[in-house]
Curated annotation (Swiss-Prot):
It comes from the Eukaryota. Keywords: Membrane, Peroxisome, Peroxisome biogenesis, Transmembrane, Transmembrane helix. It comes from Pichia angusta. It is found in: Peroxisome membrane. The gene is PEX3. The first 16 AA of the protein contain topogenic information that is able to direct a reporter protein to the ER. Involved in peroxisome proliferation and/or membrane biosynthesis. Plays a role in the maintenance of the peroxisomal membrane in vivo. This is Peroxisomal biogenesis factor 3. It is a single-pass membrane protein. The keyword Transmembrane applies. GO terms for biological process: protein import into peroxisome membrane. Residues 37-457 are cytoplasmic. The chain crosses the membrane at residues 16-36.
Amino acid sequence: MFQYCRDLVSRHKKKLLFGTGVIAVSYAVSSFVSNKLAELNERLKEENFAKEQIKRRFKQTQNDCYMTFLSLLPVLTEPIYEALKVEEITRELQNKRFERQKAKNAPVGNSTDPALSTVLSDDFSVHNEKENPMHTGVQQTKSKTQLWNELRNQSITRFLTLLYCESLLIVFLHLQLNILSRRSYLETAIKLASKTKGIKLENESNVDLDPANLFLENDEELAMGSSRQDENLAEQAFLSYSWWLLNKGWIDIKNQVESSVEDIFGDINPRQELSIEEFATLINKTQQIIDKQIYAEKESEPLTAPGHSSSTVITSLLPPANMELFLLQQTNDMEFLTNFNNNIQNSENVSKLLNELKGYLMNDQVSAIISLLVTVGISKVLDNIVVNLMNKQKNPDQEEQVPTEIPKVKLASLLASITKQSNQLTNNSLDNEVLYTLNNLQELDDLSASVYSNFDA
């Protein structure tokens, strides 16, 4: 039996060796392919996970931009309302009406001035309580015509100033927070790579790793991530720059808007009747003049380097170099300033962030988005005015209403509607339809995505 087996093996030795080799090679190849497929599958999982994290963090960053905007809105609108006191002018007009009626010995309730009554309506004079009635005495010597002209100019100026400043703030915050969020994500990704691959990498970007703490796996790491906030002085200083628009920059915008409004509306009598289309055309002409002025290059104080030209948009968002320390003093405490000035690297890091931010602000895409935000805001407001005018035309006795052309109305009545809509622009609640629309434009998301994905910056 054993001899037979030996003879059999001897006769088929080459075949057995060949078969064994084939099996061994097949196993090796199979193992190699299986390992490579497993590695590829693992890499795909990691890439998909990373993409999902990027999407989640990007979405969260955009939400943070909106919430930050709403929180800063009262700070932005309050000085604008103090500078353009439309309600104070309406009260002065009301006083003159009362005096005239008193002189005629007629009851106040018999007056029929729908334009003035609308302007003085409590429905939209939500800022009246903030005004000091004693201030109205300053304008006692002005004529009724002067007051109406002031009401016309300041109502429209305030409306457009709010829209332009809010649009600038929206874009500014989206640029700021997406720059920081991208840097934070990169830092976190490097930390993850060094941990999983055993690579020791140093933190060179000096950015905060705390937001979302997506990759921290235990409480000890979470505590370490939180403690890093004290080291991110450059990031805190960078975020402080929104103070400039809120406290100084808006004035330049207001001045440009004011002169443009005077150019277009200066010769129009408040009692002149206009169709909504004619009024929209005038507003659009005013916007075109404003855009031309605020985007025009001008010689200004240097922001990052001597001799650089700038525009009203940039100077309203970023302070000149000699005012940067003043800005930090206004927005931070002494402890922060001491720690910040102790390391020159902090100033260099802030300069890098500001240079990137200014690079975006000088881009034509950003200018186009700012103009688009204003255009959309104007369109939404005019649509609301049209709806209100149509509601006034409805006959409550008819069940089905046939759409009719909106008749011309006095400019004074349109000013009342603009004032009402301006007050809506100051409402920082989450259900503000106009502000929500502005913050969710596709073009704005595209800009944010380009900033967030610019890993070469």
